[in-house]
Amino acid sequence: MIKEAIVKIVNKEDLTYDEAYAVMNEIMGGETTSTQNAAFLAALSTKSAKAETTDEIAGCAAAMREHAVQVKTGMDVFEIVGTGGDNAQSFNISTTSALVAAAGGMKVAKHGNRAASSLCGTADCLEALGVNIDQSPEKCVELLNKVGMCFFFAQKYHTSMKYVGPIRKELGFRTVFNILGPLTNPGSPAMQLLGVYDEYLVEPLAQVLVSLGVKRGMVVYGMDKLDEISMSASTKICEIKDGWFRTTVISPEDFGFERCTKEDLKGGTPEENAKIVRDILGGQKGHKRNAVLMNAGASLYIGGKADSMKEGIELAAEIIDSGKALETLDKLIDVSNS
């Protein structure tokens, strides 16, 4: 099937749900070659200026979920994640925001991998902080109960990714897997904040999230091509609440923040990003903290810990300034290594 799919994509034709499912099933089953996988991923990501279609994403996601380890957490978990592929090289905003949300009483199940098209992925950052990222499903549930946060290392829970992981790294640009990662969290989140790299994806991925069981969430796109709620531009948001959708545009100024440049939010190596995370959770002020407050504030609102995003931002600041967020990080490190 993959050969026929590549020809179809090269001819700028969209795949149906069933075709996308069949191809991803072959890839995840190890039935294709590395060359075919690279050709498929490259062709699919460049087929259209509007990125992959909803059917292509949903079909690929369904096949990938079937090949993954699923974890029964017994609780409504939350995930904050960006698709990556925005080439912004920002520090780990989602990871830092996740720690604040966990300190605020949410059950946060992060799901990620090492960097594919950036310098430092979620796994790289957490590892540099001292977190043991190689955890069993049982240990992850323990972490959720004791700390409020766990990390599902994609390599461990999506073992079939071994067929495409090295290829993603070699290609160095975003592929459909940037979208699929956030849609295939082993903990099946009931709440999610998903940042995307393309404005076209905002409403379609909100619909996909609902079909996957998300009750409350947001799909966000920073208008400066950032896969987070942006501090350097307005952000398009599609909010999900029990099956309904509402699309709005927000700006940093709406919440009393000054705009910054994307350069102000740049990160670096895993070690450099780990220091940034600790500095922010330790109370350091500045644009990076503000970016975390915006994203953590939205998270706390989604999780029902605040009645509005504005209240969520105020709560996020209180959590950091009280030392609870840093305590949560240290507890995550301790329990993950015990």
Swiss-Prot record:
List of residues binding 5-phospho-alpha-D-ribose 1-diphosphate: 82, 85-86, 90, 92-95, 110-118, 122
Pathway named in the protein's UniProt entry: Amino-acid biosynthesis; L-tryptophan biosynthesis; L-tryptophan from chorismate: step 2/5
InterPro entries: Anthranilate_Pribosyl_Tfrase, Glycosyl_Trfase_fam3, Glycosyl_Trfase_fam3_N_dom, Glycosyl_Trfase_fam3_N_dom_sf, Nuc_phospho_transferase
Binding site for Mg(2+) 1: S94, E228
Superkingdom of the organism of origin: Bacteria
Pfam families found in the cross-reference section: Glycos_trans_3N, Glycos_transf_3
Residues annotated to bind anthranilate 2: R168
Cofactor requirements of the protein: Mg(2+)
Record GO biological process: L-tryptophan biosynthetic process
Catalysed reactions, semicolon-separated: N-(5-phospho-beta-D-ribosyl)anthranilate + diphosphate = 5-phospho-alpha-D-ribose 1-diphosphate + anthranilate
PANTHER family: ANTHRANILATE PHOSPHORIBOSYLTRANSFERASE
UniProt record similarity statement: Belongs to the anthranilate phosphoribosyltransferase family.
HAMAP family, per database record: TrpD
Name the record gives this protein: Anthranilate phosphoribosyltransferase
Organism: Agathobacter rectalis (strain ATCC 33656 / DSM 3377 / JCM 17463 / KCTC 5835 / VPI 0990) (Eubacterium rectale)
Underlying gene: trpD
